[in-house]
């Protein structure tokens, strides 16, 4: 082919042959190095875990959602910093931040224009009275959904939520509780929050389900309901694990 023209003595043909040979070598290198790595990273590594392969659209949606979420967290931290020197009770400051989170999470979910959200509330629950709110746990998004539904609530969380560099400070400021402290020790502290009108959000499975199926419920939420004298308010979440799961967070 054109590569053979490298032996030609004509300068133009010699240059053309060199370019064609370099092109062939580049194509071979990409085919056996870059392309398999990208296929492994974007397709096979995800399908082996039971997830969907990454696409350009899914990556754009992820960056969009993550950007909105991080921006919201930064605004909340700025709000906390602004409220810090003001001469008002910490309880009132927490309530302002809680109200802001409730409306920001509602706005965040509405901004996810590629995801359809359906809420079924046949009983007309208003979440006005304190209760132990329990839900199945498929995704990190579950936390945002429940905070958007419950206008006044504290949550019992796992360690990774408590220590998150993005929103851990907000969680700690609001007085959310670490499940590792033990529900027996949490009950007296939560009683004070309940007296202030807060509900308590608990994921009885203890962690996110990797396959979307509801796992065994632990007894902590039910212990709290009995100790605090609260009704148990169950919420069933469906589809969040298809957007962001434990196996495939993005």
How should each PLM-predicted stretch be described?
Residues 1-2, 27, 31, 73-77, ...:
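Hydrophobic alpha-helical transmembrane segments in multi-pass membrane proteins
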Residues 1-53:
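Membrane-embedded transmembrane helical bundles of large multi-pass transporters/channels
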Residues 51-131:
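Membrane-anchoring hydrophobic helices of lipid-metabolizing enzymes
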Residues 77-100, 127-182:
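Catalytic core of membrane glycerolipid acyltransferases/transacylases, capturing the structured
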Residues 112-120, 181-184, 238-242:
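Short gly/ser/thr-rich secondary-structure transition/capping motifs
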Residues 130-132, 197-203:
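Residue-level preference for the first positions of well-ordered beta-strands
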Residues 166-168, 198-201, 210-250:
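A cross-family acyltransferase "interaction/gating" segment
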Residues 172-194, 199:
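A membrane-cytosol interface segment of integral membrane proteins
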